[in-house]
Curated annotation (Swiss-Prot):
Coiled coil: 526-558, 738-769
PROSITE patterns listed in its UniProt record: ZF_BBOX, ZF_RING_2
Cross-referenced Pfam families: zf-B_box
Organism of derivation: Caenorhabditis elegans
InterPro entries: RNF207, Znf_B-box, Znf_RING, Znf_RING/FYVE/PHD
Zinc finger intervals, RING-type: 8-42
Binding annotation for Zn(2+): 73, 76, 97, 102
Record GO cellular component, one term: perinuclear region of cytoplasm
Zinc fingers (B box-type) by residue: 68-115, 122-164
SUPFAM superfamilies: B-box zinc-binding domain (SSF57845), RING/U-box (SSF57850)
CDD domains: Bbox1_RNF207-like, RING-HC
MF (Gene Ontology): Hsp70 protein binding; transmembrane transporter binding; zinc ion binding
Keywords (A to Z) from UniProt: Coiled coil, Metal-binding, Repeat, Zinc, Zinc-finger
The protein's name: Probable RING finger protein 207 homolog
Length: 822
């Protein structure tokens, strides 16, 4: 009998202030006071006991709808069925008043419906926040909104607003879908409830039959099997209690779920039929949420029904009767699942095919050999046919039952009668087969007696072997005791030997290579351990080599630290470096030499070594000019070709660890190509060479205020130098008187220069013939340091190119070097 969904399950009365619990049950507020859990499903553990009960709006709405009274007619104030309702006038009308008041043409646009179709609004039609009437429905949050709520939403969220009519249709569709799922859920649970109820009844009848058969069997040998009977009866009762308890618990769970299911279905029916649109829109989310919670609930699977065969009655009784009747449990029917347990070793078989299926082919061949096999073959083949027919018929009966109960199909009567006839035929065949087996029992008894005699003989042999094994075990225990007594003597002797001769106690360790070979040979060819061992040895070998290299480098660095340092480095301010990052002209000349960009060499750029300083001192001594050689100098003015010819005076590459030799005669005379005479470090070698030559020439020919002009600027353009030389070329060559004056002043200046310890580098400009006219002087912009080139090397009427000028200068320097060495 189904309960009223609007009735409390505790007080059995109609709801008063209904509240919703976490288990989806609805009770009265006064019934749930002081109870932390639901009384209907208290045995079921609750997953959310901290859930605070809140009012059940669905139940309250159903209560209000069920108590709705018929309204009186607004015109005659009487109730006469049928009643109508004018939605335009918002008034109730009886049939007479409707015909009287709404017959005029002016009332033709009024919408009049039956009072049964009218849906009364029980909830508020105004917004709680703004006290404005609802005009739209938001499909995202599933709430009614007023004009203020609509204006307060941003523009990107206003796409979810729909009219109340559309929202009403949408909610009705959702309710119908959820209700359909809930109906299907209800049908499944109802079917499970019915199945478990039938299982409960079947278990009761089956266990009653088993108990009766057990008592009948035990009466024959009541004295010997009384204890066994009580034990088996307790096991039966225990299994029955477990099965009944599980079924009852599941039945209680399903019954507890059915109450909220009926309430939700009733709510869905009311909302879809008589509820107003606003009520549907407001209560639809709650109903769907509750339906979803109910659909998520699951019920445990149906417990496996146990039969009396699982208790293994015959096997236990055979074991109990074995001391009295001499019957062994091995003669009982073999079960399908034969395990090693003493109490569950054998089960009753339902046919010979199960016994044979548990045996191997070899065992079946041995057991079926001889006379027993011939007799067994007469009944085995017909029995297999009957088993196949029985299996097919049982499957057909099962499908027919499912068609009737689950699929709700219509079954033809002829089909059922055909199944009944088939079952009767199979039963008759089994009866005939059983009679044939009973007739064969006498013949098989003789065969079994012979086998029993053979078994007895085998048992005698077995007992002899058991006694022999027992004797051997006793002997083994005695030997073990003797061996244990020898252990302290052996350990004492070994300790004394270790004190006397320790080497004999510990065998020598194998060599490293031998241990590696033993380890590798003990590993499988393709094993991971062997690969790891090889990789480990390779890694150790590599680490040893790196350690040796580090030791060698450390020794070399220690030796280098013990060496003496060279001479004191000169100041970096006196070093020059030529910027060689210039493009060369198509004719082969270096444009950087015509107007070189000279810069000071800083410590960060290059550091002089002692060998470089020694090489410069050696060059200073070689290129030192005497006074007689200087007398031959005619003019000290510089031309464009002179400056260019001194650019590649000598090419000398000086490394940090060795000094390159001076250029050979073939290189100076131009017999070897120019490219072989120019080194990669041309900037440094040229600067060192020119610096030494300037020092020598400055000492031999000190400048005077009359014939020099000092240039403080660093750079000078080649075109400016060329124009200045052209302007001075008209003055002529210097006279011999000027030379004498220079020689006399030279000796005086040598002594003063030694005291000053400072070399003043000047560029001297001479005027061939003194005149009262002003001599035009040109201020150089810090020209690069170049050696003084005597004018007598070149003929006055000969115009030489840059390459020829370089060759003339190199030949002159070579001659001076030869004179110096002689």
């Amino acid at each position: 009998m189904e309960e009223n969904p609007l009735q409390c399950t505790i007080c059995k009365n109609e709801f008063e202030e209904p509240i919703l619990l976490s288990c989806q049950h609805t009770t009265c507020r006064k019934c749930s006071t002081g109870s932390p859990s639901c009384k209907s499903c208290s045995p079921i553990p609750s997953t959310s006991r901290s859930h605070t009960p809140h009012p059940d709006k669905l139940a309250a709405f159903l209560l209000d709808a069920s108590k709705e009274e018929m309204e009186e007619c607004a015109n005659c104030e009487q109730i006469s069925l049928p009643m109508f309702y004018c939605e335009t006038c918002q008034q109730s009308l009886c049939l007479v008043c409707r015909n009287v008041t709404h017959q005029a043409r002016m009332f033709s646009s009024h919408k009049i419906i039956s009072s049964d179709e009218r849906s009364k609004v029980y909830s508020s039609s105004l917004c709680k926040d703004h006290n404005e009437p609802y005009i739209l429905y938001c499909s995202d949050v599933r709430k009614l909104v007023c004009i203020q709520c609509f204006n307060g939403r941003p523009l990107e969220e206003r796409h979810s607003f729909i009219s109340i009519e559309q929202g009403h249709r949408l909610c009705l569709e959702r309710i119908e879908q959820s209700a359909a799922k809930l109906r299907f859920y209800q049908s499944e649970r109802q079917e499970e409830l019915n199945v478990r109820q039938r299982v409960l009844d079947e278990n009761a009848s089956n266990f009653d039959d088993a108990r009766a058969s057990l008592y009948q069997l035990c009466q024959q040998i009541i004295d010997t099997v009384m204890t066994t009977r009580e034990t088996l009866a307790k096991e039966l009762v225990k299994q029955q209690e477990q099965s009944d308890e599980q079924c009852k618990r599941q039945i209680k769970e399903i019954e507890a779920v059915m109450g909220p299911v009926r309430l939700c279905l009733f709510s869905a029916q009311i909302l879809c039929t008589t509820a107003s649109k606003l009520d549907v829109l407001q209560l639809c989310p709650q109903l769907q949420k509750r339906i979803g919670v109910l659909l998520d609930k699951t019920i445990d699977k149906l417990p496996v029904s146990s039969t009396p065969d699982s208790i293994e009655v015959r096997s236990d009784l055979a074991k109990a009767l074995e001391p009295f009747l001499g019957m062994s449990a091995a003669w009982c029917p073999i079960s399908v699942s034969r395990e090693g347990s003493s109490s569950n070793s054998y089960k009753r078989g339902s046919g010979s095919h199960k016994a044979i299926s548990m045996l191997s082919k070899f065992q079946a061949t041995i057991d079926l050999a001889g006379a027993f096999g011939e007799l067994f073959g007469k009944v085995e083949h017909p029995l297999r046919q009957l088993v196949t027919a029985l299996s097919s018929t049982s499957q057909q009966v099962l499908e027919t039952q499912r068609d009737l109960t689950i699929r709700r199909c219509i079954i033809e009567k002829e089909d059922v009668e055909k199944l009944v006839k088939t079952c009767k035929k199979i039963e008759a065949g089994l009866g005939m087969h059983s009679a044939a087996l009973d007739g064969m029992q006498s013949e098989m008894q003789e065969i079994w007696q012979e086998q029993l005699d053979r078994v007895r003989r085998q048992q005698i042999i077995y007992r002899e072997k058991v006694e022999e094994i027992l004797n051997l075990r006793e002997t083994a225990r005695q030997i073990l005791t003797a061996a244990k007594q020898l252990v302290p003597y052996v350990s004492c002797i070994l300790n004394m030997n270790a004190m006397i001769d320790p080497k004999r106690c510990h065998p020598p360790d194998p060599a490293p290579m031998e241990s590696i070979c033993l380890e590798i040979t003990g590993i499988e060819p393709n094993s991971q351990n062997r690969i790891l061992a090889i990789e480990k040895e390779e890694e150790n070998r590599r680490l040893n080599q790196e350690a040796k290299k580090k030791e060698e480098l450390a020794g070399q660095s220690a030796v280098m630290k013990t060496l003496k340092h060279g001479k004191i480095k000169r100041k970096e301010m006196n070093r020059m470096m030529l910027n060689t990052n210039r493009e060369r002209s198509p004719g082969g000349t270096d444009t950087a030499l015509t107007s070189p960009c000279i810069r000071r060499l800083t410590t960060a750029l290059k550091e002089e070594t002692a060998s470089e300083l020694d090489a410069e001192e050696f060059l200073d001594e070689i290129f030192e000019l005497s006074g007689e050689q200087y007398d031959e100098v005619v003019d000290g003015t510089l031309t464009e070709e002179d400056r260019c010819s001194s650019a590649l005076l000598l090419s000398m590459e000086i490394s940090s660890d060795s000094i390159s030799p001076l250029p050979s005669l073939e290189q100076l005379l131009g017999r070897i190509p120019l490219a072989s005479r120019v080194t990669s470090n041309i900037g440094f070698s040229r600067g060192a060479m020119l610096q030494s030559l300037n020092d020598v020439f400055a000492l031999q020919k000190p400048p005077t205020p009359e014939n020099i002009s000092v240039s403080e600027e660093r750079n000078v353009l080649a075109s400016a130098v060329r124009n200045a030389e052209k302007r001075k070329s008209g003055a002529g060559l210097p006279t011999n008187s000027d030379k004498d004056e220079v020689i006399e002043k030279e000796e005086i200046e040598k002594e003063t220069e030694k005291e000053k310890k400072k070399v003043i580098r000047r560029r001297v400009k001479k005027v061939s013939e003194p005149s009262e006219e002003e001599v035009t002087t040109f201020t150089f912009n810090a020209p690069p340091d170049c050696p003084f080139v005597p004018q007598e090397i070149f003929e006055s009427d000969e115009k030489l190119g840059t390459f020829e000028a370089k060759e003339r200068v190199l030949q002159s320097l070579k001659q001076k070097m030869n004179q110096k060495t002689e």
